[in-house]
């Protein structure tokens, strides 16, 4: 794994910012997720400081990741989530950041703080080895995806780390395909924008 942020701050182009909706107590109590309406997105896109606007697309299916061999005590399984942003906002090697429709391997960009949490919190308390960024790129990941209509198992590979964005990113093409196939009865709402 090559840390793409070594050229600057991260894999993202430096002129972009992430905008999120405020979480309100009333939404929490009602079980609602804060999201931008179409009118809010249209209004935001007309602001003079916005040249381009993209939406974060959340997975409409459950994600479980298995790393290593949990049965042999050499790995673990965890719940995860995926989000996607339009590829034009990702300043990464496109030969690594691509997904072929119908493919069986998902390239992933992880937040660097997740690796730090694993190394300095989880691994140290569980007697597991610390992992470098390069090592994570060599680790075999199995993703188990469970939607409302279908399930799927896929391989995964970490292709970069980010210091600037706090989500688990997958290519937009994969997200569109997986949401449509696994949970066609659900429609993703944008809780964050990239501008």
Residue ranges of model-derived segments:
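Alpha-helical transmembrane segments
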Residues: 1-22
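Short secondary-structure boundary/capping segments
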Residues: 14-16, 98-100, 185
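Short extracytoplasmic
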Residues: 23-43
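Short acidic amphipathic segments
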Residues: 41-56
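The feature marks short, hydrophobic/small-residue-biased sequence motifs that occur predominantly
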Residues: 56-62, 66-116
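Basic-flanked hydrophobic alpha-helices used for secretion and membrane insertion
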Residues: 61-65, 106-195
